[in-house]
Every structure is written in structure tokens, then in C-alpha cells.
UniProtKB/Swiss-Prot annotation:
Keywords: Coiled coil. The gene is INSYN2B. Residues 255-269, 292-308, 329-365, 374-388 have a biased composition (Polar residues). InterPro entries: INSYN2. Pfam families: FAM196. Residues 24-52, 215-388, 492-529 are annotated as: Disordered. Residues 309-323 have a biased composition (Low complexity). Belongs to the INSYN2 family. It comes from Homo sapiens (Human). This is Protein INSYN2B. Residues 235-254 have a biased composition (Basic and acidic residues). Residues 503-513 have a biased composition (Pro residues). Transmembrane segments: none annotated. Residues 411-448 form a coiled coil. The keyword DNA-binding does not apply.
Length: 535
């Protein structure tokens, strides 16, 4: 299969490429062989330069050719189905055919039972490197036979998405080959030279839209070239059967920013650690070349990205989260949801240039719309999942606050209980002390030959003495007596000041203490029933 792919997958390249001479005989040699799947051999025989040489160099533009020569060793190719008309001036024809590398994604059975078909279709982007070099040498019959061969390949995987019918006035032909892969029908818009240089990397299947290795391949479209493509091809009407995304005529700047956001998305620190499991079987070594190239493409695309208004941080925010999930994609049946969640993560964290692809502005005609995208069906669910996660986190924080409030309440209750216990213990101590004082007062009254306390209560018939409340009266008496002495001192001091001025006779300190005691006894008799009622 991989050898047949060499003729199935011609990609955009000029006919008279200098490096393509050594690859001229290989596609014919591979076409004569039986259909076999050799991934490691194909991956090892093709050097990274073969991968990078997909970037077309037009001799008409030496400046751009020099720039592409400087960068072609860094850029892995981007593959998309574009069938432009033959350039009459140049006299050569550029045709690119691609299958969706994520065909196995919806059906995990392909990994084991139908490995030949899936691997061959997955292998196509890297297997056709030498066919890329001799694109100009392929005749029309070879192209038609390659289309028919790809039809046979596509019929093995007829479970995949099939919506590939584009009717446009400018379209030369849209073969039914593209039942699985992305289709970009690049219309003639005056400058095919820029179209050649940009290897029609505008279209990537939405299923693998943010997979690291596919983005590594898409990064072959440098921002400068993508700017030229988007500026020169306004009537770009492309459908992606892989994801059902329909691109209406793009505004050049916004399409460039969105496209470059996907190509720049692979230029992150995680690019060196691309997961080949996402696109190819685990034993495939072709993506190692792609990984190295994409790690190099990070150097070339990122500096020129300000021209096309695509920030490298758009993909860099979302990319480190990709490899962890991407390794599970081929083996699990719910890998589509993982990729969709990856897409939503990258879209939610990207700048406004690529946020326009998601549900922020789904109705604008100049942004990418994907109403029929299989991933778009899961976008609201994944967004709602993130919202529910945020809500659950908030609920957890609220519960924690409630727990804290409950803990504080328990602390307050404990403190209140301790205060109540201390009050109770102090009350008991007070009672004990009052009983002791009562006994002392009673003993003193008996020693003095009195039948009453100093406050005037009877020792035997005092009703308050039974509740140990009368003792406070004696204490109060002592306090009042001390207070009277204190007031006497204060009055003496206050009168000493006017004495210096008018020297009036001080009469208040000379009052006899006997009436004071009688008044205190009267007050205590009146108040004795109110004191210590709480005991």
C-alpha cells in the first residue's frame, strides 16, 4: 500500500526541482512492486530533506526561493487535497491528494484487523515524499490512475465521513477520491506562484486538527506563504469531508491568523516530543522525522508569525496538554472526544484570531464555520464539562468554607461551654467562700457577745443566712466603710484647695460615723432580698 501511495499522493511541487532528480525513478519502481506496508523502511529511507523539500520553490521569485531554501529543511509538509487548474504560463500541474490520518479514530478495530488499509492511508503523507519530487513527471494517466487507486483505498474505509461534493464555477474537478481526507479546492486567483509555495496547508481534518504530529505537518506552511495564499485566494470554497467543515470565502487576514494559529500550534516546547501514536501505528518511525522537522519548523514559523497576526502563544498554551491525551487516541474508541476536548482547550486559550473558529463568532462569513463538524457536536458538551468542573470547584470551595464555618461554630460552642463551666465553678467557689465568711462572722459575733452580724441581721433568725446571702452584707458593709473613708479623703483634698483661697471650715469630715452605719444598715435591710438572687 505504501508503495502504491507513492503514486497516489503527489503533492504540490514544481516540476524542475533540483533535488527531485534522484527521486525520479523511485515512484515507478514502487508502482511495479506488490502492495506492501513497510513503515519503518519508508520512514528510514526518506531523509528529513525529502520531507522538507515539499515546500515548492518557484524559479520566478528568487528572493522567495532563497527564503524557502533556507527554511525547507525545517518545515515538514502540510498535506491537503487541492486540485488547482494547471498553470498555463508555467506549463506544469500541481496536485495534492490526502487521506485523513485519523480514519482509525472512529473505529479502533482498524488498529489490529485492518491494519494494512489504515496504515497505508496514515502513511500517505510521509510515504509520498519521493513522489513529491517528481510531481511534474507524472502524466495525466498517472494522475487518473492514482485517483482510481485512491478510490480503491477509500472503499476499504467507507465508514469514514463522505461529504465531498463541491460545486463551484471555478473548480476544475473534484474527484470522489476525497471521501476521507480534507479537500481544499484552491481556485485560480491570479498568483499560482504563491499557491505553489504554500502547499495548500489550509485544510486539516477537524478530527486531527490539534494533534501534534498533524500540526507538525501543517507547519510546513510558513506564515509568509500562508499570507500569500490567503491574500491571493479569496474565493476559497473548501469542504473537509473529514470534519464536515465548510470554509466560506475567507477574509485574508482572519483566515491567515486562524490557519497560522494551527500551524504555529505545533511550535511549542512539546513539539520535540510529538506523539506519533496519534496518526501512525506505534511502530512507525516516519513521524520521528516529522517530529524533528516540526521541532525545527518552530524556529522558522514563529519569528514570521507577527506578519499574519497569529500569536505563537495561541498554540503554546494548548499544546502541552496534547501529548498526554494524544497517546491514548488510537487505542480508545472515545478518542474523538479527547481530540475535541483538546481543541476546545486550545480554542479557549487562543487569541481572538483563532477564537473566531470556535463558538464565539460562529456566524461570521469570514471565519471558519463548522456546523456539520463531528467535533462541533461535542464542543458544547466539552465546554459544559469545563463549566461543570468550575462549578464543582466552586461548590467544593463553598463546602470547604461551610466546613470552616462549622469548625468556627464548633470552636465558639466549645469556648461558650468552657466559659459556662468556668462560671459554674466560680459560682460554687463563691458559695464556699461565702459560707466560710458567714462562719467567721458568726464566730466573731459570738466571741463579741452579739446575736447579730455587723450588718444587723440576727444570727439565728436571719432568713438570708440560710442561703448564705447575708454574708455579702457584712462584706458590703466593710466596702462601704472603706468607701466612706476614701470619700472623706477625697473631700478633704477637694476642700484643701478652696481653703487656700477662702479657707472655709471643713465640716463634712467631722460627721460622726454612727449615723452612717445606721443608714448602711437600713439600705442593706432593704436590698437584702435582692442580692444574690441568682444563687
Amino acid at each position: 500500500m505504501a508503495q502504491q501511495n507513492m503514486k497516489v499522493r503527489p503533492v504540490l511541487l514544481k516540476r524542475n526541482s533540483l533535488e527531485s532528480v534522484e527521486f525520479v525513478k523511485q515512484p515507478h519502481h514502487r508502482r511495479s512492486k506488490s502492495q506492501q506496508v513497510r513503515f519503518k523502511e519508508d520512514g528510514t529511507t526518506k531523509n528529513p530533506t525529502g520531507l522538507a523539500e515539499v515546500d515548492v520553490q518557484t524559479p520566478e521569485d528568487p528572493a522567495v526561493m532563497g527564503k524557502t531554501q533556507a527554511t525547507r529543511h525545517h518545515l515538514p509538509p502540510t498535506y491537503s487535497l487541492s486540485f488547482p487548474r494547471s498553470q498555463k504560463a508555467g506549463g506544469f500541474r500541481n496536485i495534492a491528494i490526502q487521506t485523513s490520518p485519523s480514519l482509525r479514530k472512529h473505529f479502533p478495530v482498524f488498529k489490529r484487523k485492518r491494519l494494512t488499509a489504515s496504515k497505508s492511508l496514515v502513511e500517505m503523507p510521509t510515504a509520498s515524499q519521493s513522489a513529491i519530487q517528481v510531481n511534474g513527471n507524472l502524466s495525466e494517466q498517472d494522475i487518473v490512475s492514482s485517483d482510481l487507486a485512491y478510490l480503491r483505498l477509500a472503499q476499504h474505509l467507507e465508514d469514514g465521513p463522505r461529504r465531498v461534493k463541491v460545486s463551484h464555477a471555478f473548480l476544475p474537478r473534484v474527484p470522489k477520491v476525497q471521501s476521507n481526507g480534507p479537500v481544499s479546492i484552491c481556485l485560480e486567483a491570479g498568483t499560482w506562484r504563491s499557491l505553489e509555495k504554500a502547499t495548500a496547508a489550509i485544510q486539516v481534518p477537524d478530527d486531527i486538527y490539534h494533534s501534534p504530529s498533524w500540526e507538525a505537518r501543517e507547519s510546513a506552511l510558513s506564515p509568509d506563504r500562508s499570507a500569500e495564499v490567503s491574500n491571493s485566494i479569496h474565493p476559497l470554497d473548501d469542504t473537509r469531508p473529514g470534519d464536515g467543515r465548510r470554509v466560506t470565502p475567507l477574509d485574508s487576514e482572519k483566515s491567515t491568523s486562524c490557519l497560522n494559529a494551527t500551524s504555529v500550534a505545533s511550535h511549542t516546547p512539546g513539539t520535540e516530543e510529538l506523539k506519533p501514536e496519534l496518526l501512525l501505528p506505534k511502530d512507525n518511525s516516519d513521524d520521528k522525522d516529522l517530529g524533528s522537522l516540526s521541532s525545527q519548523s518552530k524556529e522558522t514559523c514563529v519569528p514570521s508569525s507577527p506578519r499574519t497576526h497569529s500569536s505563537p502563544s495561541q498554540g503554546s498554551h494548548s499544546q502541552p496538554a496534547h501529548p498526554g491525551r494524544a497517546s491514548d487516541c488510537p487505542s480508545s474508541s472515545n478518542n474523538h472526544q479527547n481530540l475535541v476536548s483538546l481543541k476546545t482547550n486550545s480554542a479557549s486559550k487562543s487569541a481572538p484570531g483563532c477564537q473566531e473558529q470556535t463558538a464565539n463568532n460562529p456566524t461570521e462569513s469570514d471565519t471558519l464555520e463548522f456546523p456539520n463538524c463531528p467535533g462541533s457536536n461535542h464542543l458544547p458538551s466539552s465546554l459544559s464539562r469545563s463549566e461543570t468542573k468550575l462549578q464543582s470547584n466552586r461548590e467544593i470551595s463553598d463546602i470547604n468554607q461551610i466546613h470552616l464555618a462549622r469548625g468556627e461554630l464548633c470552636d465558639l460552642q466549645g469556648r461558650l461551654q468552657s466559659v459556662e463551666e468556668s462560671l459554674h465553678s466560680n459560682q460554687e467557689k463563691i458559695k464556699v467562700l461565702l459560707n466560710v465568711i458567714q462562719d467567721l462572722e458568726k464566730a466573731r459575733a459570738l466571741t463579741e457577745g452579739r446575736n447579730f452580724y455587723r450588718t444587723g441581721q440576727d444570727l439565728n433568725n436571719c432568713s438570708t443566712c440560710q442561703n448564705t446571702a447575708c454574708i455579702i452584707y457584712s462584706v458590703e458593709y466593710d466596702f462601704r466603710q472603706q468607701e466612706g473613708r476614701f470619700h472623706e479623703v477625697l473631700q478633704s483634698l477637694e476642700e484643701a484647695e478652696p481653703v487656700e483661697e477662702a479657707s472655709p471650715p471643713p465640716k463634712s469630715p467631722a460627721e460622726p460615723p454612727a449615723p452612717e452605719k445606721q443608714d448602711l444598715r437600713r439600705k442593706t435591710k432593704k436590698v437584702k432580698k435582692k442580692c444574690f438572687w441568682w444563687i
